């Protein structure tokens, strides 16, 4: 059953109607789902498990994994519970005092020998037999200390000195212990900052080493590099934990680093609101998408700073819009608990480091409830930022060279499209390519997994006739935006064993139109024969009308239908020069919105090894949230294509595309070779 808010106020919240009380109702709704699965007060937060092949615990004898699962359930659900406990210490759900439950289980989790102990750091080292290993528990200690801070008066302050010492000793092992050299360093930093704040001695050299490392991961534009990739960890980790660290430790003891963290968060706020669409929807992109609207927690992180620049009315509008995106769907929960998916259960999305309780990381979005009722986040009138300034067919494009992110806000359909670069994935990591290597990510068309071995949504797939292999784009270099055209290069089956000239590739060039994106990509092949396909977005198939059209040598397929919620959907894909055919493929179990789906795909082939054959591939995908017909000019927008080369293959020189509305875009790959960044 979907969440339905009881409290609505369209005066202060004209877009969503949600208020602070609405958020309390939403948090209570989620906690009721948790506690309906807890049979006895003594039982840990272990939830019903729907998926068993990918997620952990992976085997019945993996004791440390069960302990990690206990801790994930406790600490992540505490994200939701802590602000509710602070707001209402007498909260009682399913017959349990929520304050008493978390007070008891936090202490028990930290107590050696207790049946629900999650394992001290030293115990796990001995159990694993690896003294250089980091453990999942380190992640959860950070959630624990944040929540103990949020409801400090109700839980932490009520422990005896002896009980506090037990918890502090437990935390110290992870605070000083091994971590992963990426966002995990912030977990250790907050553990130490909490201990320091509560009067316990810490190793300040360890703190400073982690802090300087985090600072060094900064790539610009408010984004941090996490591992190799850029993703929402920059938002729900770096730009949430760093502001909290500033409050607890940095402003007082490391003012230079704290000032930098503040500067970076404020830089993110300059553009981050435009990462979401007109409805406040979060885009399905990057790993750990089961955390869903946790992406909005970066706004709350910024509002904690001494010199915050976030627009509170816009921040709440987006946070509430994203909350409704997920919680109002009838497939969001499994037995009262958020599924391992983006909407309903969707296994292609799930990583092996997750368990049934992992989705409660979305509880970070509820940390905004720590802001008092009179805070501007709750009192400012909702506004919709960029969307209030765009004309009916306007598109705003933001390109960030630091993290290699280009996102466009399309007023015509209310969608936001993300195009990314600096992507490096192993050529066998199909899952990683779905998360990062799609050519476009759309807030209203979440990415589709493989519908066939040689067809992918929003990806090129190349069959190499020489090696007899199907190859996919696992590495994407970034050049950036030039004269309204975004340039990138994608390699197929990139590896370090071969120089790049021995790897099949395609130069990417794309630009926005009101309802989507036009592509004018150029093949960069070292050998033929090859076959190539390019898929549209995945389209939810709940009864779909399929229409085919042709005009002036171009071909289009239009799909009309509805998504799982009944929302009207329409998509059209059009092919021009360089392509041979346009077809559809139907699929089951590959779409995160609906069980059945359709992908439109273009296909072509190149046979002659060194033939001067068409190099440029021109196509368009447009979408709208309506069954109202696209106009012919929207489906077939190109008036003419002018080539520099006399054979009109696009082998050299600029290619100029003139649209029927008079817009011209010049595609010119000259000069990008020396300015490609990964």
Question: Which ranges hold each PLM region?
Answer:
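Extended repeat-based interaction scaffolds and adjacent low-complexity, acidic/S/T/P-biased segments
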Residues: 440, 454-678
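Low-complexity, glycine/alanine/valine/leucine- and proline-rich hydrophobic stretches
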Residues: 387, 391-476
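Short linear interaction motifs
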Residues: 52-62, 343-346, 384-390, 501-503
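Low-complexity, Ser/Thr/Pro/Gly-enriched N-terminal "stalk/linker" regions
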Residues: 2-72, 100-105, 114-115
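Carbohydrate-active enzyme catalytic cores, enriched for enzymes
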Residues: 113-126, 167, 277-284, 290-428
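Mature N-terminal, pre-catalytic/accessory segment of carbohydrate-active enzymes
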Residues: 1-2, 678
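Composition- and surface-driven signal marking solvent-exposed, interaction-prone regions
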Residues: 256-257, 287, 311-318, 375-382, ...
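Aromatic-lined, polymer-binding surfaces characteristic
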Residues: 70-71, 79-91, 95-300
């Amino acid at each position: 059953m979907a969440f339905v808010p009881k409290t609505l106020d369209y005066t202060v919240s004209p877009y969503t109607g949600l208020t602070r009380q609405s958020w309390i109702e939403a948090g209570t709704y989620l906690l009721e789902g948790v506690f309906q699965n807890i049979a006895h007060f003594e039982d840990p937060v272990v939830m019903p498990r729907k998926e068993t092949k990918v997620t952990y615990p992976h085997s019945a004898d993996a004791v440390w994994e069960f302990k990690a699962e206990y801790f994930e359930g406790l600490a992540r659900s505490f994200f939701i519970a802590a602000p509710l406990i602070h707001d209402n210490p007498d909260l009682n759900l399913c017959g349990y005092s929520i304050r008493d439950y978390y007070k008891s289980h936090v202490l028990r989790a930290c107590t050696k020998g207790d049946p629900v102990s999650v394992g001290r750091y030293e115990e796990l080292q001995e159990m694993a037999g690896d003294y250089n290993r980091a453990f999942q528990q380190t992640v959860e200690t950070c959630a624990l200390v944040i929540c103990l801070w949020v409801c400090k008066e109700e839980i932490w302050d009520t422990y005896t000195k002896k009980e506090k010492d037990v918890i502090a000793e437990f935390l110290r092992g992870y605070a000083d212990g091994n971590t992963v050299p990426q966002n995990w360093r912030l977990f250790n930093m907050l553990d130490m900052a909490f201990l320091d704040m509560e009067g316990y001695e810490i190793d300040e050299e360890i703190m400073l080493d982690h802090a300087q490392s985090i600072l060094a991961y900064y790539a610009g534009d408010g984004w941090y590099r996490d591992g190799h990739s850029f993703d929402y960890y920059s938002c729900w980790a770096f730009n949430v934990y760093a502001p909290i660290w500033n409050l607890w430790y940095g402003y007082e003891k490391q003012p230079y680093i704290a000032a930098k963290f503040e500067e970076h968060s404020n830089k993110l706020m300059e553009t981050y609101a435009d990462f979401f669409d007109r409805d406040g929807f979060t885009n399905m992109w990057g790993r750990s998408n089961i955390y869903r609207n946790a992406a909005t927690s970066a706004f709350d992180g910024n509002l904690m700073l001494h010199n915050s620049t976030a627009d509170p009315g816009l921040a709440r509008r987006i946070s509430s819009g994203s909350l409704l995106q997920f919680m109002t769907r009838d497939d969001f929960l499994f037995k009262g608990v958020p599924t391992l998916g983006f909407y309903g259960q969707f296994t292609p999305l799930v990583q092996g480091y997750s368990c049934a309780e992992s989705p409660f990381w979305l509880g970070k979005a509820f940390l905004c409830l720590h802001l008092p009722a009179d805070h501007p986040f709750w009192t400012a009138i909702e506004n919709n930022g960029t969307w209030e300034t765009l004309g009916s067919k306007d598109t705003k494009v933001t390109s960030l060279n630091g993290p290699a992110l280009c996102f466009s806000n399309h007023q015509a359909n209310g969608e936001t499209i993300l195009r990314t670069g600096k992507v490096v994935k192993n050529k066998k990591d199909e899952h990683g390519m779905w998360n990062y290597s799609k050519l476009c990510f759309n807030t209203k068309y979440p990415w589709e997994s493989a519908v066939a071995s040689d067809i992918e949504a929003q990806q090129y797939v190349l069959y190499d006739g020489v090696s007899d292999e199907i190859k996919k784009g696992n590495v994407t270099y970034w050049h950036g935006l030039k004269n309204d055209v975004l340039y990138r290069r994608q390699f197929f089956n990139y590896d370090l064993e071969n120089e790049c000239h021995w790897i099949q590739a395609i130069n990417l060039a794309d630009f926005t139109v009101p309802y989507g994106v036009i592509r004018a990509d150029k093949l960069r092949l070292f050998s033929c024969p090859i076959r190539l396909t390019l898929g549209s977005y995945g389209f939810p198939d709940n009864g779909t009308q399929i229409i085919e059209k042709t005009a002036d040598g171009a071909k289009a397929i239009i799909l009309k239908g509805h998504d799982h919620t009944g929302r009207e959907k329409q998509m059209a894909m059009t092919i021009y020069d360089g392509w041979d055919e346009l077809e559809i493929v139907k699929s089951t179990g590959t779409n995160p919105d609906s069980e059945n789906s359709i992908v439109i795909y273009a296909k072509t082939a190149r046979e002659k090894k060194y033939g001067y054959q068409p190099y440029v591939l021109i196509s368009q995908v447009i979408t709208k949230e309506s069954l109202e017909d696209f106009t012919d000019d929207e489906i077939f927008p190109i008036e003419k294509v002018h080539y520099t080369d006399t054979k009109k293959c696009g082998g050299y020189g600029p290619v100029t595309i003139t649209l029927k509305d008079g817009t011209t875009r010049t595609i010119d790959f000259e000069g990008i070779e020396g300015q490609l960044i990964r």
